Curated annotation (Swiss-Prot):
Keyword Protein biosynthesis: yes
Known partners and oligomeric status: Component of the 30S ribosomal translation pre-initiation complex which assembles on the 30S ribosome in the order IF-2 and IF-3, IF-1 and N-formylmethionyl-tRNA(fMet); mRNA recruitment can occur at any time during PIC assembly.
NCBIfam families in the cross-refs: infA
Any single GO CC term annotated in Swiss-Prot or TrEMBL for this entry: cytosol
InterPro entries in the cross-refs: NA-bd_OB-fold (IPR012340), RNA-binding_domain_S1_IF1 (IPR006196), S1_domain (IPR003029), TIF_IF1 (IPR004368)
UniProt name for this protein: Translation initiation factor IF-1
Gene3D superfamilies membership: Nucleic acid-binding proteins
Organism listed in the record: Chlorobium luteolum (strain DSM 273 / BCRC 81028 / 2530)
All residue ranges annotated as the S1-like domain in the record: 1-72
Length: 72
């Protein structure tokens, strides 16, 4: 059985939480808890409240996600 593909959607950072986690409001007005992907962490890209980001969400649990890109 193949693994389901992640859903990619854009959102805005609402607040920064401990352990490199963020509360993100998605463009469909859903709020998710998201952590930073390894590449963003590796390159020391700062993410602040108000930043527009791309989030990957698993189809199995839509309350959690992974931030994969920060728009300039």
């Amino acid at each position: 059985m193949a693994k389901e593909e992640a859903i990619e959607i854009e959102g805005v950072i609402l607040e920064a939480l401990p352990n490199a986690q963020f509360k993100v409001k998605l463009e469909n007005s859903l709020e998710v808890l998201a952590h930073v992907s390894g590449k963003i962490r590796m390159h020391y890209i700062r993410i602040l409240p108000g930043d527009k980001v791309k989030v990957q969400i698993s189809p199995y649990d839509i309350s959690k996600g992974r931030i994969t890109y920060r728009y300039k």
